[in-house]
A protein has these predicted regions:
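Extended substrate-binding grooves/exosites of carbohydrate-active enzymes
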Residues: 9-306
Length: 306
């Protein structure tokens, strides 16, 4: 309540929760004092045929399905989440990695956020932090996804600038980003400046990169990208990358993946065997419109197979 003298001027109500989070080098992520591995998924904000408009019942349905299969975390790929999602995760017990940007000041696409980054990045990031820093389900901030800046010498300064904003507005949570150029980022300090080094794909690089990281912690910020079509089985059953068929489907045996990705067990092995791996966020929790890999130009393919 805000008073001017004895006169009530404003009332603000905010939900909150009490829990502890800690990341210990070489040992992992601890939630309420217990070592916890992220068994997460990346999820776009759209709700399939319902579209991108927020639907509380549909959001909660997705969370129930994810929890039923053993998922304990969602990465909001690749944008700031709706308040309805965060509230539902608070109530239903799902951890959140809240992501902010898919692009900084180097373009992924001609008419992208790069045109607005210099003016709006701090304002937009502060808005995210202020909106959700009281929500217990949010356990980590993510400041970027596969940004082209990761290749540039010196752009680790931008990463540190964004991370410092997160620390300034919320000193209680670690900060990460999803990086898909593991060799570049460990050699140009792009990964070293982060609280948590998040790697997209290439789990076979974890052991190599761990030795070069001062944090001594590795996160699979985006993993797998295995493709499959429900009820479709291809023979012979063999592992394939970017396999294409006349029916524009993929085998439901989960043995097919993209050129840059791998099968789920490739990631599972790393996170089960390596104590410094704190878990992963599989691509993707639910199918979405767009990216019909490997059928990019094959009409009428328009939905993802991940």
């Amino acid at each position: 309540r805000l008073y001017e003298g004895d006169k009530l001027k404003d009332i603000y109500t905010t939900p909150f929760g009490i829990r502890s989070i800690e990341i210990i080098p070489d040992k992992g992520f601890f939630l309420n004092g217990k070592r916890t591995v992220f068994k997460g998924v990346c999820n776009h904000h759209d709700l399939g045929p319902l579209g991108a408009a927020v639907n509380d019942a549909a959001i909660r349905r997705q969370i129930r399905i994810l929890k039923d299969m053993g998922c304990n975390a969602i990465r909001t790929s690749h944008n700031m989440p709706a308040p309805e999602l965060i509230r539902a995760c608070d109530e239903m017990g799902m951890m959140i990695m809240a992501e902010s940007f898919d692009e900084w000041n180097v373009a992924k696409c001609k008419n992208g956020y790069n045109l607005l980054f210099d003016e709006w990045a701090e304002k937009d990031l502060v808005n995210l932090l202020h909106n959700f820093r009281n929500n217990p389900s949010v356990v980590m901030w993510c400041i970027g996804n596969e940004v082209p800046n990761q290749w540039n010498e010196g752009d680790c300064k931008i990463a540190k600038w964004l991370q410092d904003i997160c620390h300034r507005e919320d000193p209680t949570r670690p900060v990460t980003q999803g990086m898909d150029a593991p060799d570049a980022v460990v050699n140009n300090n792009f990964a070293a400046v982060m609280d948590v080094a998040g790697f997209n794909y290439r789990p076979f690089k974890y052991k190599i990169n761990y030795k070069k990281l001062p944090q001594r912690i590795v996160l699979g910020s985006e993993t797998a990208s295995t493709v499959s079509s429900r009820g479709v089985y291809k023979f012979p059953v063999e592992r394939k990358a970017m396999a294409k068929y006349d029916d524009h489907q993929a085998s439901s045996y989960d043995v097919e993946h993209c050129g840059w990705s791998n099968l789920p067990e490739d990631d599972f092995i790393q996170h089960e065997d390596l104590p410094y791996c704190i878990g992963e966020f599989v691509w993707t929790g639910f199918d979405y419109l767009g990216e019909p890999t490997p059928y990019y130009t094959d009409w009428p393919s328009h939905s993802s197979l991940f």
